[in-house]
Amino acid sequence: MSDVAPLLEVRDLVTTFPVRRGLVGALLRRPHEAVHAVDGLSLSVDKGEMVALVGESGCGKTTTAQTIMRQVDATSGSVIFEGRDITTLDAGDMRPLRRRMQIIYQDPYESLDPRFRVRDAVLEPLVVHGLAGSKSEREIKLVDAMSRAGLTPPELYLDRYPHELSGGQRQRVAIAASLMLDPELLVADEPVSMLDVSVRAGVLTLLDGLRSKGDMGILMITHDLSTAAHFADRIIVMYLGRIVEEGPAREVVRNPQHPYTRALLSVVPRRDPREQVTPQILVGETPNPVNIPSGCRFHPRCPVAEDRCRIIDPALAPAGPNHHAACVLVEERNR
């Protein structure tokens, strides 16, 4: 991490969703309950950096992305973008910032309007934000964005409809549309999870190139640690609304400290077939986010849990240079 202020800084973010009690619950005056989707999360993204937020389905990754993008309101905490806490801004003040914050969605088959040709889909952000300009200016930006997204020659795609494209091509169209506004922050929510394996690497390499060639920061949401290890600068591992480990990507992969991270890595295929790793099968399902377990929220599934883990809720503790993990065993090892 540099001494320069980060492009994006999330501080103690909490996002909850109320649970309806129903008629019986109201009559019995049962207390109101809430889903704790994000529970005290802090992270940062620097310019020119790719940060991967990793975890199982239901851990709160996507809700984190939606809260950062102001698609979902934060319950508490702050999201600092370019020095401003965007959680406090009204729609009018937020609008110009949206130009510099773009999101790529998971499903390329639903993110594009089937009625729009590729040309119209890519130009739409300019129209929405009133930045269309002259026809010649639009064409220059259109061709540039298409080329940067790997859709070359652009003329081959501009008049096609989404149903005439492959999944990888659709995702590249979505990326091209996001580039039309020259964003400084790009949030990629599982950008390749619905694509064929044969085209995933191409899309990820594209994102990596966008990050490395300029000042764009990328927050990539993924459940795939192998993808994160290969492309991200830093990895943040999330479980049940909280960060359980964070650090430089290589360090987290080579020297995982939290039992949950170790379990995720144990099922990642190895390049060297001679490298034998015993998969760690986690027992049970992720607990209900309405009823968070006491103590360490991972203890019901943890293979090394101790009695104290049911009581102590560990904070992130140093596990190496810029490397932290939330586990009492890590705290002990580094005292």
Language model features: what each stretch is:
Residues 54-56:
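The feature captures the beta-strand-to-loop junction immediately N-terminal to the Walker
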